[in-house]
Amino acid sequence: MSQLPLSGTFTALVTPFTPDGEAVDFDALDALVEAQIAGGVSGLVPCGTTGESPTLSEAETTAVIRRVVEAARGRVPVIAGTGSFSTKKTIEASRAALAAGAAGVMIVMPYYSKPSQDGLREHTLAVARAVPAPIVLYNIPGRTVVDLSAETTERICAAAPNVVAIKDASGNVFRCQELVRRLGDRLTILSGDDALTLAMMALGAQGVISVTSNVLPRETSAVTRRFLAGDLAGARAAHLALLELHGLLFVEPNPAPAKAALAALGRMSAAVRLPLVPAGEATRQQIAEAMRRLEARREAS
């Protein structure tokens, strides 16, 4: 199993759709990948929460992953979101993603069925045994209604050497702290919340899987790049400059605000698939104003 570099800013890619939402806009996806790499991100994560994975068909998911891999051309690693409420489906999706060229997979904790900690452990170990590739765990209890504990994560890591990282979107810096204490030398910890990236890196996380970097890859990756280079003051300044936008991209369900921002920049349609709906006018105006303030600050510096 090859090593997977996991530090810096990884973009949780949106999936561009045609204006009617009926098909994936692959031209816009190609352009998005190119913009991310030009902006200095460390890697790409298609078909996660931000990629609207629940409303993609299996064929679309595989096609999106393959297209991202092709567009990246080996310049950055591609880690595909393959998690599901079903262990069997997670294994099947992970194998398909690897066959499409992904360097690793990210598996969200099973949602809806509300498994116990033992269930989360057995699910993850079953996937790890069946998928001999780097695996990133994804804990986002606000969406899955199950919270992978630090103790369970430690038990998983003891039994599954190919579990190499965790995207922690618990919103709990104390959880990050406990993960670092237990597993800091064994497991790479990545923030799953742009607004907490700097705090989590101060505790020992190595980067972020970011939503905001879809819109501003250069500015978002500057936070992690500066921190990892030892420039705490520069990282803090870059982080604080983005804080307003981080918040605005979640005032409505993700990824509708991010797609609204990208549409305003002319990069894709704002279309999302039901049951999501496009961001409202008030949100679009707030995002536009925040972007203008960021641009003015950049020009003044």
Curated annotation (Swiss-Prot):
<comment type="pathway">
    <text>Amino-acid biosynthesis; L-lysine biosynthesis via DAP pathway; (S)-tetrahydrodipicolinate from L-aspartate: step 3/4.</text>
</comment>
<comment type="function">
    <text>Catalyzes the condensation of (S)-aspartate-beta-semialdehyde [(S)-ASA] and pyruvate to 4-hydroxy-tetrahydrodipicolinate (HTPA).</text>
</comment>
<dbReference type="InterPro" id="IPR013785">
    <property type="entry name" value="Aldolase_TIM"/>
</dbReference>
<feature type="binding site">
    <location>
        <position position="50"/>
    </location>
    <ligand>
        <name>pyruvate</name>
    </ligand>
</feature>
<feature type="binding site">
    <location>
        <position position="209"/>
    </location>
    <ligand>
        <name>pyruvate</name>
    </ligand>
</feature>
<keyword id="KW-0456">Lyase</keyword>
<dbReference type="InterPro" id="IPR005263">
    <property type="entry name" value="DapA"/>
</dbReference>
<feature type="site" description="Part of a proton relay during catalysis">
    <location>
        <position position="49"/>
    </location>
</feature>
<dbReference type="InterPro" id="IPR020625">
    <property type="entry name" value="Schiff_base-form_aldolases_AS"/>
</dbReference>
<keyword id="KW-0457">Lysine biosynthesis</keyword>
<comment type="subunit">
    <text>Homotetramer; dimer of dimers.</text>
</comment>
<dbReference type="InterPro" id="IPR020624">
    <property type="entry name" value="Schiff_base-form_aldolases_CS"/>
</dbReference>
<keyword id="KW-0028">Amino-acid biosynthesis</keyword>
<comment type="similarity">
    <text>Belongs to the DapA family.</text>
</comment>
<dbReference type="InterPro" id="IPR002220">
    <property type="entry name" value="DapA-like"/>
</dbReference>
<feature type="active site" description="Schiff-base intermediate with substrate">
    <location>
        <position position="167"/>
    </location>
</feature>
<dbReference type="GO" id="GO:0005829">
    <property type="term" value="C:cytosol"/>
</dbReference>
<feature type="active site" description="Proton donor/acceptor">
    <location>
        <position position="138"/>
    </location>
</feature>
<keyword id="KW-0220">Diaminopimelate biosynthesis</keyword>
<dbReference type="Pfam" id="PF00701">
    <property type="entry name" value="DHDPS"/>
</dbReference>
<keyword id="KW-0963">Cytoplasm</keyword>
<feature type="site" description="Part of a proton relay during catalysis">
    <location>
        <position position="112"/>
    </location>
</feature>
<dbReference type="GO" id="GO:0008840">
    <property type="term" value="F:4-hydroxy-tetrahydrodipicolinate synthase activity"/>
</dbReference>
<dbReference type="GO" id="GO:0019877">
    <property type="term" value="P:diaminopimelate biosynthetic process"/>
</dbReference>
<dbReference type="GO" id="GO:0009089">
    <property type="term" value="P:lysine biosynthetic process via diaminopimelate"/>
</dbReference>
<protein>
    <recommendedName>
        <fullName>4-hydroxy-tetrahydrodipicolinate synthase</fullName>
        <ecNumber>4.3.3.7</ecNumber>
    </recommendedName>
</protein>
<keyword id="KW-0704">Schiff base</keyword>
